[in-house]
């Protein structure tokens, strides 16, 4: 599909245009790295001299926020400058699930229109199907694992003619893996394939399974080669290491070298490669015209304990909306253009990078709504405070608000709302660990922050995007798959419903529990109807079979009427979940 970038150039005077060269841009966006997991953020065990050097040569941000506490949604916010209430990405994508809407304009597309060479190296996680890969979203070149490094091959992914097979694989065995993925539950896939992830170049697999002990170095190698091979254009290089997301892999050079186990080895290897890149920019005399940004996509995966990171002194981590889930390390370096050795507590967000970088590239006006703000004046003068509030978005919905030192979380910062949870109000200046809930002591402050939240809620325009265009062409395939995988309860209740002329799609993992499920659905506005075993939502003493049967009967009935929001049986996922919890 041809997209038209609705971006208008700044009207510079001729003299200013000649005097100012468009800067190169490098963004390094690590995966699941915690707030404390750098030397310059007070890690007691992990040594990161190269990133610490960046902090000495630039600005370290202590209050930098990403748009989500999970990967896909966070990356969508970074690359679009838009909150997840707008950009259509609510959760995490799995192989061959939905991708970010093709209509979204990425930073790569916008910079490409301004004459930039654009390359993506590492984890993408915004869709691996045709129309959603990096090379479909503005990048000239892509090299990496297209989603998390614990995910598997997609059934329809194509192999390059020069593909390298490892660990006893050949084309026939690789296609067997694709068939396993096509016909098995997610739990069975992970058990049988054991994190056999594909490495892509462009839109095809070039290595399977990927040797993950060497990916970090290879990502940076290819990024440096890309810069070397594009001397005539300004460049945008987006380096997205697949780690320290689990499973963890370190090369022999770094394995066992840190004081923080394998997790520390992985972070120190990333740091060493950051140093190689900085040295290259310095050696090639590119540093004074290259904006380099280092950040993490969300907080650490704490449930993995020693294989997860640390968000200390913040509370929470990945999946949560306490500070440790969405506040991450961020360092910005631009030699000769911004101050050095500065630590700032200004509230800055990943969505601010899009309008800021586009300002430097010569554009600042967009027809699509951009939620980020241009922080170029702050980068010149870090004493400025350009915003005093930031909204937390979970699953495409406004989940909380920070204003000044205050944070209000009406449904708590937990990843799942439990019976008995109460709203939370914290003062970060007095309580950075969010341990003292003040919502009863300060009712006026709660009301004030509720009003601020309403402002963001009223502008929410989540598109019909989490579900791909209805898959009528694949209808029989999905029906057969549903019947094959689903247990007898689902199959029997579904047979009559499958005869109806209901469009077929695949569910978003944003709605999924830890169990794999296939669903046929119709999306209307922002509501999705589907068949799925929401077993974890019921009371502990509810027999799983009874709960599942009740849910499926309710959903099947609603599914037939889902095209009519005014129907009494119109399916609303939130309402249905509540019925189950109270049953």
Question: Residue locations for each model-derived region?
Answer:
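Membrane helical hairpin/interfacial module
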Residues: 512-583
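Formylglycine-dependent sulfatase
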Residues: 2-6, 17-424, 428-455
